[in-house]
Amino acid sequence: EIYPKQFEKLSQLSEQYSIGSAHFSTRENIQLHWVVLEDVSEIFRSLAEVGLTSREACGNSVRNVMCSPLSGVCSDEKFDSTPYALATAKFFLRNPMAQSLPRKFKFNFTCCEKHGMVRMVDVGLIPEIQQIDGSEQKGFKIFLGGGLGNRSFVGHQLEDFTPEEDLLYTSIA
């Protein structure tokens, strides 16, 4: 999530400390280029004032948790996965268990089978609903091990259905 006041602050910081433009990465991170080292602490303070951080933008950590922009509006989705993506991001942000991983680690939630990059990231999640004991149960189809590096891999399906109450435990594992 990003809000207008945060965009305004990023624009101001780009004009004041960078080259007047910002770059949006493929992981939905925003980069300011040509920043002078002496200005970095002030930039960090200014970002924090509007609820932004530079944490987990690089290094061997859980990176920005992505969610399809069609989540919540896609006619083929079983349910909106946005709250689950936000909760996952909140859990892993600044969490010590996610700070010194062997490599960067990427999550991607999508809305349905047709959209998103769930087979091209470390953990890809598609919302699913199953009938269990006569009632509808929300959960996710999970794919693991995808990547787009110099040796690309297509993720493999972990299981057909992980109930929503097990999602955090499965994500930690």
Residue ranges of each PLM-predicted region?
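Small-residue-enriched alpha-helical segments and adjacent helix-cap loops
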Residues: E1-Q137
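Residue-level recognition of phosphate/Mg2+-coordinating polar/acidic sites
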Residues: D133, G146-L148
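Conserved histidines in hydrophobic membrane contexts and catalytic metal-binding motifs
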Residues: F140-F143
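Internal alpha/beta scaffold segment
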Residues: L148-A173
